């Protein structure tokens, strides 16, 4: 066992080797390296697979023997300061290493085909391998300085990959936004690290925890300063894991290639913040204010992400807000003291979300030959629909991921999310109500996404999208801004009846172009009849190298939840994950000898599943073609129209829709307050520099110039005159000095 741990430092170096080899090949043999570019996918997958095998072996040894290994190299040592680098192998490290390597391998296999026609193929794989190396270095770090170094490397890689297609202005702006937003958190993290070093005199985790646990409860250090340091550390996690209010970069990060979205949202960047909170949880526990803040930020984020996902039309942005919401669940768990549950949901969500993102990439890949390569069209769910018969494997795996995220048993996310919901009741009923309500919203927007993508008919073949002011039930559209075009004839997507319209609650979609803007007036969408002479192209299923990762992630989505299921009813914690996490940290279940209450578990599960099923049913009712017999909900409309509160309901729906479409007005607030304030300050600084500072400098030059010119014309060229003037000036200064000083 000792022999295996000694070589654990190889794990983060393996993917880094690929990056170095690609760079060396481009430097020495540029033409051959570019011509044989797809060859580099093999060592990328191979080296990361070796890292995965080492991680699995370390995890097995830890499960069997509950061991923790730490190896350090002294870098700088003197009487007052010492800095050591090394690696720490404990249950948290092994969990994260397996997660990063398994998802990373599947993303690499998927990317080989997805990026095969891109000119930046080699650059993409070098960035991707460096990304994996940075994240593996982060999770194996033995102290806060190492964490900060790899933390910045992860941020740099995300900047490069989000802006991979930097020639597109929107991608360049997105990576800049991610970079600037994360700088706020990174600066807070750095200040927190320096503050803790000032308190404890050490960067090592064990020393930090021991000293803080002794000093803070016994008032050995200023509690306000310790709380401030802990808050600054948590601020780094807030930015990296896209928690409110530093979440604004996450939806824009979808401008990068889809495999990067899968990696960022599943196993690397957003998981880094959760990892930091989990690693520093022994420190946060002794500061109750920080624990309350963590849980509060988590519950706000999970609700905010769910509401913002309700009306998105971009399939990747919908998944991005879903990630934000699920990360809120994961952040809520350690805040309420449920460490094991947080890691459990981190694992299950990572595989499910990687499956959904790679599935969306397969969908986008199939749509691009039809609509073009613009993300505004290829990622627009308004142009999709009816893809079931064209991409059946993608549809099946996407359906698995959707059910898992909705919390439907026996898929993975059901087991972990249900534990978070149960623990939230023990901590705060208010938080529990919000968490349960968000579970219903999650089921709604996930099935909305699934139905808009796979149900009904392929909407791209319906030409001449147009708006019409004639009434439909609700006064808002599904996608946004109206387009004033004449309507020739109508064609309904789910039936062959004419004069059927699409509202916010219908199964259809509206206009495909323009910004997403709310409509306060009635807007219905019509489609002109198909021309029989037109020959259409249709989507096609992806290649095997893209489908294989989907199927493998589908298996993970089905079975990875088993690691957290207690199989022994007589003893709590008799599951793989609980044996793995030794020593456990759980403030809500401190009595580990109590048996598992299966009756309580089943009761809570029935409640959570019922809420999810209600969300699924609502989405199916409003967006599914199965209910087309209602003639576009005329029955429901007639019932609701009888109610005198219809106008109030309309206003509520409009408020929710406007909130979701405008990203909760948070981006607008930042743009109008922070951005405009910084630009105003920059303009003021520019004015002061040009007019005041430069004015003073230039003023001295101008005055000297005119004085010189005046003296030049006063002089006659006679030396005797110069001597006279000089003597006169000297005499005047002597007299002034003698009489007045």
From Swiss-Prot:
GO biological process, one term: ATP synthesis coupled electron transport
Localization (cell): Plastid, Chloroplast thylakoid membrane
Pfam families tied to this protein: Proton_antipo_C (PF01010), Proton_antipo_M (PF00361), Proton_antipo_N (PF00662)
Main location per the UniProt record: plastid
InterPro entries xrefs: NADH_UbQ_OxRdtase_chlpt_su5_C, NADHpl_OxRdtase_5_subgr, ND/Mrp_TM, NU5C-like, Proton_antipo_N
Domain of life, per lineage: Eukaryota
Name used for this protein in its record: NAD(P)H-quinone oxidoreductase subunit 5, chloroplastic
Species per Swiss-Prot/TrEMBL record: Ceratophyllum demersum (Rigid hornwort)
